[in-house]
Amino acid sequence: MRFDLQVIASWIEPGSRVLDLGCGNGDLLEYLKKHKQVIGTGIEFSEEKAARCIERGLTVLQGDFRQEVRDYPEGRFDVVVLSQTLQQISDPKELLIDLLWIGKRVIVSFPNFAHWSARLQILFTGMAPITDQLPYEWYNTPNIRVISIKDFKRFLRLFGVRTVREMAINTHHHDYKGTIVRSFKNLRATYGIMMLERVT
């Protein structure tokens, strides 16, 4: 399981009701179901990946989670997970409002576009950066939002959302190993992970 997913799993309490958005092949859900006895549901856009999840015995809906989340009542889940997907969302503020409505807490992970390797590429080549975390050319990337850890924290302050936990990590896109970054996070971390809740 990817390193960021390992961190996310460690933050989830046993027996929690979990919704995993963009759950991919279901690695996180399967782990949580097996090791933490969660009541887990996933939503995955890809028919192929959703079918794989179902083959693994997971409860997964195939569809656009931006629409699907609006069908759930307030507080339906203890935790909603949005892993490495926020940068592909056209209306992140609207989505987070919906997620904080249906989930008591929301865990978000995203690639840090301010990592030093991306900065150096822009500085020395003058071109859009391509890194292990951002492996696309500018013309074929699914990423439509450029987020840094600093940007996201500022957004949360303006938006009035409380950060319960946060971690900056250094890992490659599909790596099972990584390190926790404790200083100069916006410069040195490849990913940010945050647990959020509404301020009541």
Where are these regions (language model features)?
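Conserved alpha-helix/loop element of class I SAM-dependent methyltransferases that forms part
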Residues: 1-15
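Class I SAM-dependent methyltransferase "Motif I" SAM/SAH-binding loop
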Residues: 22-24
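Glycine-rich SAM-binding Motif I of class I
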Residues: 26-30
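Class I SAM-dependent methyltransferase SAM/SAH-binding core
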Residues: 31-68
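Short conserved loop adjoining the S-adenosyl-L-methionine
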Residues: 68-74
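A short SAM/SAH-binding and catalytic strip from SAM-dependent methyltransferases
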Residues: 79-90
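S-adenosyl-L-methionine-dependent methyltransferase catalytic module, highlighting the catalytic core
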Residues: 93-101, 105-200
